[in-house]
Amino acid sequence: MNEAVSPGALSTLFTDARTHNGWRETPVSDETLREIYALMKWGPTSANCSPARIVFTRTAEGKERLRPALSSGNLQKTLTAPVTAIVAWDSEFYERLPLLFPHGDARSWFTSSPQLAEETAFRNSSMQAAYLIVACRALGLDTGPMSGFDRQHVDDAFFTGSTLKSNLLINIGYGDSSKLYARLPRLSFEEACGLL
């Protein structure tokens, strides 16, 4: 049986963590990005399919390629973030299943149903994006996930000729708490959950 993490860890991961819009000028190293992936890859996915593919955009050139795809409200926060992760999904993720799920012919589940393959890739890459956020927080980083962007432009700018399709963007860095908005409410258990 697993032990519960400490109250401090819960605060870091959930209750005190915030979505950041402004950033300190502290770089995020490539080694740290590797640490993030080394943690997030262990989060569960359907049949261990692991469809997420991530481009960590950290150069001025990379940010300029992103610029035309960003909504006006997401522009400045993204251009000033040390890193913007483009979380994409691989439409042919099932080609890796003989390695990732050797217990049966899982590849055929998806090659026989393009709709199931797309739904599985999108849903599971979304879960993996959440694992990325938790991994960042566990390593002392802050994040700002965004869905306000032109997916087609990102796909054209970064993934032309590949099997990848963008899902969402996540800014990563060390947040400037002076630029935080007031904490917004969340739904209560009674409003969001049911017991059967």
UniProtKB/Swiss-Prot annotation:
The cross-references to CDD domains, in alphabetical order and at most eight, read: RutE-like
Do you know what upregulates this one?
A: Up-regulated by the nitrogen regulatory protein C (NtrC also called GlnG) and repressed by RutR.
Annotated GO biological processes are: DNA damage response; nitrogen utilization; pyrimidine nucleobase catabolic process; uracil catabolic process
Q: Which InterPro entries match?
A: Nitroreductase, Nitroreductase-like, Nitroreductase_HadB/RutE, RutE-like
Could you tell me the superkingdom of the organism this chain comes from? Answer: Bacteria
For this protein, the Enzyme Commission number is 1.1.1.298
Q: What name has this protein been given in UniProt?
A: Probable malonic semialdehyde reductase RutE
Q: Which organism is it from?
A: Escherichia coli (strain K12)
Upper classification of the source organism reads: Bacteria, Pseudomonadati, Pseudomonadota, Gammaproteobacteria, Enterobacterales
| UniProt gene name | rutE
